[in-house]
Amino acid sequence: MLARKSIIPEEYVLARIAAENLRKPRIRDRLPKARFIAKSGACNLAHKNIREQGRFLQDIFTTLVDLKWRHTLVIFTMSFLCSWLLFAIMWWLVAFAHGDIYAYMEKSGMEKSGLESTVCVTNVRSFTSAFLFSIEVQVTIGFGGRMMTEECPLAITVLILQNIVGLIINAVMLGCIFMKTAQAHRRAETLIFSRHAVIAVRNGKLCFMFRVGDLRKSMIISASVRIQVVKKTTTPEGEVVPIHQLDIPVDNPIESNNIFLVAPLIICHVIDKRSPLYDISATDLANQDLEVIVILEGVVETTGITTQARTSYIAEEIQWGHRFVSIVTEEEGVYSVDYSKFGNTVKVAAPRCSARELDEKPSILIQTLQKSELSHQNSLRKRNSMRRNNSMRRNNSIRRNNSSLMVPKVQFMTPEGNQNTSES
């Protein structure tokens, strides 16, 4: 059988195969850099190979609070069920040892009414009734159908023990639920940070800036901001320090170093000789393996609990030569905040060199500002010339349209032979 000929020419197939072989190898996308603090404020750290797990049980209350909600609710339910079942078994054993169960089984009708003074617990005939009595004792429901008598001192001991255990379980579990609902990090959900940080010139100095705001009307009392740079460093002895933390001072004119977070604020750090960013230029920033961690702490006005909000900025999230736009305006005697522009930035003139080079050569800043002013003036000239050209073109088009709309004059003869001119 003859083979079917291909519809595609063989020359085209060979050329296509050769072209695919000559293609450059595909470069994999660069993996995202690991960060210690996520944008949401969670710590991106995994604990492995912990041998002494029993240390968590030494502080059982904190362990219960730190658990997830589904685990906490399961433990909450199981603690009550297990205590009810445990004491139900004890009540059934007390009734069984005293012979109350056999007494209820042997006698019936009017004879059972005489047993109320001789049994330990009235109306406990089976394990089900013992379980119901255990719930009534611990939760203090008090239906009245089952009650204790003075016949069994052991039953009195079990009653006291169950009350003590029930109070302990209520205190621990209800306190755990309350602490989980009133945790301080819940308040931090309404404390927001700008997605990007910027580096620009302010008051003649290069500054690292970011914006922070509070969405609630209730204030954060004694709010303070701390900034740290975390990066990998190598000592002169060759030791590699994977987590090297360096504090960054915050430029705050208030001596107490607290901020009044009534409206979104731009937190500024002046890049000077004390700053870890002093030797970093715009070109070096893209290759830097650093992370700027921001910590906002304060006291919640309504609850008095100390709260903390965190975020971080890696090198890719720091915009050089940008500035935050203004979002606070005054409208009819009231200050208004437009949160839709919370993280918006605009490009501004900023030298691309490091702060060290800027201190050594202050003329760089003057030249940058002059170039920016010239480019701004040129853009204004171009804009004005474009406006003039557009207006001239518009006027010319209007004139042409008016000339085309002029009404022509028509001449016609009257019966007397005179010519009259009229416009149609």
From Swiss-Prot:
Chain positions of site Role in the control of polyamine-mediated channel gating and in the blocking by intracellular magnesium: 170
Tissue/organ expression: Predominantly detected in fetal and adult heart.
Cytoplasmic side: 1-69, 177-424
Membrane topology, from the record: Multi-pass membrane protein
Main location group: membrane
Annotated Low complexity bias: 387-404
Protein's name in the database: ATP-sensitive inward rectifier potassium channel 8
Organism this protein belongs to: Homo sapiens (Human)
